[in-house]
Amino acid sequence: MSIRFESIEKLTELIKNKEIKPSDVVKDIYAAIEETDPTIKSFLALDKENAIKKAEELDELQAKDQMDGKLFGIPMGIKDNIITKDVETTCASKMLEGFVPIYESTVMNKLHDENAVLIGKLNMDEFAMGGSTETSYFKKTLNPFDHTAVPGGSSGGSAAAVAAGLVPFSLGSDTGGSIRQPASYCGVVGMKPTYGRVSRFGLVAFASSLDQIGPITRNVKDNALVLEAISGVDANDSTSAPVDDVDFTSDIGKDIKGLKIALPKEYLGEGVSEEVKTSVKEAVETLKSLGAEVDEVSLPNTKYGIPSYYVIASSEASANLARFDGIRYGYHSKEAQSLEELYKMSRSEGFGEEVKRRIFLGTFALSSGYYDAYYKKSQKVRTLIKNDFDKVFESYDVVVGPTAPTTAFNIGEEIDDPLTMYANDLLTTPVNLAGLPGISVPCGQSNGRPIGLQLIGKPFDEKTLYRVAYQFETQYNLHDAYENL
């Protein structure tokens, strides 16, 4: 039997009951990748030999009834900006082509402790800069629901692989929507946890005050299980939060009667397509039928999210990416005749167009004479956006709206128009700016392309988001659609 579309929960049950061996699961997954990924192009690197070896070691533990770990024998795919010891980590960039880390990221250590099995590294926008996975130096990933459409980005490979049944779960990173937007486009579940919930140690930095690692799965409960496994304070990350409550599954089945949900009028305003508005309005009616109270509210500074985000994120990126100088590691220009030339040529040849655009933008925003007008002002706007959310959360438990203003666009449609591409982040960037948790769950389709519903919660209240998402999923899901892709 093929297990490629089974849930983590079901696979765990089969393994615990000894109906299937971890090595059978892993081999089945590689067979699926061999069959499907030449078309989808979600993986950048596979770790097949080590994965099968690890799975066979787990077979022996299974035979002895020593099945420790929440994710015992469960295959996983990891976005290629998350450090994996002894497995190439490129950030989908020429700059890091061939870079093999000598240490492990915290999330990978946690997943290894739970006995999950690394299948391979997943494609992404270069250095997580992009919303379509088209800025990858190596390949363009396709949307499993429609091969003429992008999978979203920057975690496009992570979302596409899960939707196509190539792994039961993946990890992505979310700086301004990079987990939630591709989850929306690919019809899967993507969670951006509260800033500080998951350690960033071993995540190649894009914008350090915004980046957060999170899980992508085909259902809500699986997502909660993975977040339980990777959450927690870490001495290696001073921004990780000492929050003890990492139980997201015990209350997941509780009803949502009486829960107060806010629908910001700005989230169904200008720029949001009619089909997305219709699906979200239907989803709101579903939430009401489940017993939730939904009211319209205002988040007046929403429209300033994109300009504020792109100034702050680009500024932090220009500082973070200064470390790629062609000397210590990464691409090294062979033509340079001097130290200055080495810096210039290594960076101009090693980085792609979108990365260079954001470095230029960030360096300009931080430069003398412009710092106050751009960076400082953007930080003030960030505070206003956070204050808007704080005010709403005084009276409401959850904020609801679309994840993205449209369904997935066509490959090649927006890659030469950065402003149009950036506009897709309208509804996701405010969540990062405020440091809040946000989850995308499927809520509809238009012309075969999925639509995502975004649920936004109070800081460190992922538990409530999972409850609402789980109840909604009982009324609408794409579980039967995946196998027909």
Curated annotation (Swiss-Prot):
Reported EC number(s) for this entry are 6.3.5.7
* Top-rank lineage group of the source organism: Bacteria
Gene Ontology CC: glutamyl-tRNA(Gln) amidotransferase complex
Keywords assigned by UniProt, alphabetized? ATP-binding, Ligase, Nucleotide-binding, Protein biosynthesis
Reaction(s) catalyzed by this protein? Answer: L-glutamyl-tRNA(Gln) + L-glutamine + ATP + H2O = L-glutaminyl-tRNA(Gln) + L-glutamate + ADP + phosphate + H(+)
Q: Where is the active site?
A: 79, 154, 178
Write out the GO MF terms: ATP binding; glutaminyl-tRNA synthase (glutamine-hydrolyzing) activity
Q: Which residues form a coiled coil?
A: none
Q: Which Gene3D superfamilies match?
A: Amidase signature (AS) domain
Could you give a single Gene Ontology term from the biological process aspect? translation
Q: What is the annotated role of this protein in its UniProt record?
A: Allows the formation of correctly charged Gln-tRNA(Gln) through the transamidation of misacylated Glu-tRNA(Gln) in organisms which lack glutaminyl-tRNA synthetase. The reaction takes place in the presence of glutamine and ATP through an activated gamma-phospho-Glu-tRNA(Gln).
Q: Its quaternary structure? A: Heterotrimer of A, B and C subunits.
What family does this chain come from, according to its entry? Belongs to the amidase family. GatA subfamily.
Protein's name according to its UniProt entry: Glutamyl-tRNA(Gln) amidotransferase subunit A
Report which gene this protein is encoded by.
gatA
